[in-house]
Amino acid sequence: MSKRPAFPGMGGMNMQQMMKQAKKLQEQMAQEQENITTQEFTGKAADDMVVATFTGDRTLKSLFIKPEAIDPDDPDMLEDLVIDAVNKGLKQIDQATQQSLGKYTKGLM
């Protein structure tokens, strides 16, 4: 009885080798994700009038608002600045995640 042929396009890897490789990649991805969660990401709006700082797991760590950004006659402006700073911080997390984990997910979708 002959051995089963390797899967075409897999470089001659058998199923056990493929599983080992998949486990190794999974461990590397988990380490990359852990590295991201320990980093801090900052979004700033209007010359640092509002600064939002996040951890890599998307937790808001701090929100700094300069007193001059608080205008009782224009609360919408402050809302817009906070939204802008928060969105910029979250975008930084997304970009770092894509840069770090993108090398593992290329070609999967």
UniProtKB/Swiss-Prot annotation:
Cellular component terms, GO, for this chain's entry? Answer: bacterial nucleoid; cytosol
| Keyword Secreted attributed | no
Q: Name one Pfam family in it.
A: YbaB_DNA_bd
Q: Which Gene3D superfamilies match?
A: Nucleoid-associated protein YbaB-like domain
Record localization = Cytoplasm, Nucleoid
Report whether DNA-binding shows up as a keyword of the record: yes
Q: What is its main location?
A: cytoplasm
Q: For the region Disordered, what residue ranges are annotated?
A: 18-40
Q: Which UniProt keywords apply?
A: Cytoplasm, DNA-binding
Q: Which GO terms describe its molecular function?
A: DNA binding
Tell me which InterPro entries the record gives: YbaB-like_sf (IPR036894), YbaB/EbfC (IPR004401)
**Self-association state and partner proteins as the record states:** Homodimer.
- Tell me the NCBIfam families matching this sequence: DNA_YbaB_EbfC
Its biological purpose? Binds to DNA and alters its conformation. May be involved in regulation of gene expression, nucleoid organization and DNA protection.
Q: Which family does it belong to?
A: Belongs to the YbaB/EbfC family.
Protein name (Swiss-Prot/TrEMBL): Nucleoid-associated protein Ldb1634
What's the source species' lineage?
Bacteria, Bacillati, Bacillota, Bacilli, Lactobacillales
